[in-house]
Amino acid sequence: MAASGTTTKNVPSWKVSGDWFDVCKCNMPCPCEFAQAPTYGDCAGVLAWHIKKGQYSDTVLDGLNVLGLGSFTGNIWAGEAKDATFGFFIDEKANEQQRQALQMIFSGKAGGFTAEFAKLVGDIRGIEFAPIKFELADDLSYWTAEIPGKVLAKAEALTGPMTPPGKRVQTINPHKT
């Protein structure tokens, strides 16, 4: 994950980089990653972000986590999504300035990639603060994101017949910001 943005003179420059994973009810690999319709016509999933390095103006965001829960019907990337809703959980470790910054970034109000994503979703149901556990295997073989008692999302890396032992299938977005 690497994203940044600037919108108006009232919104400071920002940049975050780290890990972004998602899991949903669709077949693997997720059709959304390739701008295709959901496997069963609708999607319900969890997006997890771990910010390794980030800033919003002078506010440091390093080490914080954000989880998003969303659902929609139709191909979201083709502009055909209906009933698209999304809600966020922001790491309770964040102080007040960090909370405000993360709300601006992930609601899309700070511009950049997340603003484009927010346009696709339309209905953001709310933002809550919660303890978020995020775990990623060093070899990328699995990841887990959890809000105890509320959300558990976990996945294992894709492998295939042509994947060398110990290596993982990865989709890389070459876009640089």
Locate predicted features:
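Short Fe-S-cluster ligation motifs
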Residues: 54-66
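Bacterial Sec-dependent signal peptides at the C-terminal "C-region" and cleavage site
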Residues: 1-5
